[in-house]
């Protein structure tokens, strides 16, 4: 029933508890599910007695009642371009911006920590959040210890392109090196500051357009980096890559275990509701430990009710009065309602380019 629903509606998304990686390991060891928040965010472990680390072998993690205080994203292609233009080491410039994000997160924790529990009695006084049994005049700082804060990354494909003119499909080695470096630094910051920092694959619904404008303003139009009105979200291959669903799963698996603060993997199914194909790819994704989305371009005619994948004109009645549903990044969204788009122009351009998204 689940596969049948996904192949017709693109929901539900699928979370592996039996495969590889962080989420499955929490379930296998503790019987705890790390449920995704929103379209892709995951909480880091917080243990009942030990906090950031287990007090002993019997200590168990808690995920219910916790939250994320926000994500701040690195503009990786721009950081690389800045380092090159100023003849600086890329990692030196990257360190500067990572430290900047770190200080912003610390400031956010400090600012929120001064708030009184009375600002949200249901969450902070009546047990809505973990530890939320404070008095109305108590400050909420103790509750924030179990809250995560994310270092986001976008445009990893464009970083690889600006580095050596190759995409993540063609190469990807530099991108892997950078992600390993960022992940290591985030973990160091976490231990030093005592806050639950995590690395997050930013969906960048609007940021993907803003970052292009920022890049062009300083460094102009660079082929395969800033020549489109959008950049790739998080660690995904470029949407225009003519690759198979299996190839896309394998290519993105390289980055999967480095981004435990937030991630989703999805492929486009050009298979016209082929249930067996969808099921096969979903089972493969579960074996690989993915949080997997099924991507179709769902369309239906508002005049005659005809449904079809990815139509712009109804073949039955000739109407352009269509409703279309596409995956925005992690969420589903109406790319057309009664013939008109509800998405930003840069996002609509990305949707037009999709072959393997």
Model-derived segments and their meaning:
Residues 149-162, 180:
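Contiguous, well-ordered alpha-helical segments that form the cores/surfaces of helical PPI scaffolds
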Residues 354-357:
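Intrinsically disordered, low-complexity regions enriched in Pro/Ser/Thr
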Residues 1-145, 166-168, 172-327, 333-335:
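Conserved catalytic cores of very large enzyme subunits
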Residues 318-320, 331, 335-352:
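Phosphate-handling catalytic cores of nucleic-acid transaction enzymes
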